[in-house]
Amino acid sequence: IEKVMRDNHLPLPSDEGTDGYWIKRGDATAQCRDDVRFCRDEGELAHAKDSFVQRGIQDVVVQAHVQGDLVKFYGVEGTGFFRCYYPGDDNGTKFEDDQMNGRPQHYPFSSRCLQADAEKLSRLLQTPVYGGDAIIKRNSDYVIIDFNDWPSFSRCREEAARAIVKRAAPALLLSSRRNN
């Protein structure tokens, strides 16, 4: 995902920074707390890389930590369905690391631009049903820090279900016609 984002000039964190690093497995979605780790410095990062290798995980992604508001987003490509939430508002987090930047400040940002970037990424990855995380910086810029297929849609399941049906209906109708 990171290579696709870089090649297509989509906003993602730098490889280097001064506020620490995140390391996560690059071969699959995070399945346990140790699959995504914050490292305060390059020494901790080196230790974390070794830990991943010991667990049999060779493919890792390293991103510089970005200060700002964590926003979770959910979308269904081509349907207009796109929702953003601040998990820090209600402590709706999967792992405590989601609270690394503290309570959200609700920095202004363009949800339309985030949606356009997420839709572009969904097309490039052929992932029409998607979710992810972004960090909104104080200056209103954002970076996408995670992107995956078939998220939980935990905060908008009913709306998402309608959008998924809308997205799938043409393909289902076409398939049905071919079988008749």
Give names to the regions the model predicted.
Residues I1-T18, A28-T29:
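Conserved N-proximal alpha/beta basic substrate-recognition cap immediately N-terminal to
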Residues E16, G75-V76, I136-K137:
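Generic beta-strand structural signal
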Residues E16-D34, I57-V71:
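ATP-grasp fold ATP-binding core
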Residues W22-K24, F73-G75, S140-R155:
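A short beta-strand motif that forms the metal-chelation/ATP-contact edge
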Residues G26, H65-V66, Y74, D133-I135, ...:
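Anionic group-transfer/hydrolysis microenvironments
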Residues C39-L125:
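Phosphate-binding site of ATP-dependent enzymes
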Residues T93-I144, A163-R178:
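A long amphipathic alpha-helix within ATP-dependent nucleotide-binding catalytic cores
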Residues C156-R162:
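A short acidic/glycine-rich loop-to-helix N-cap element
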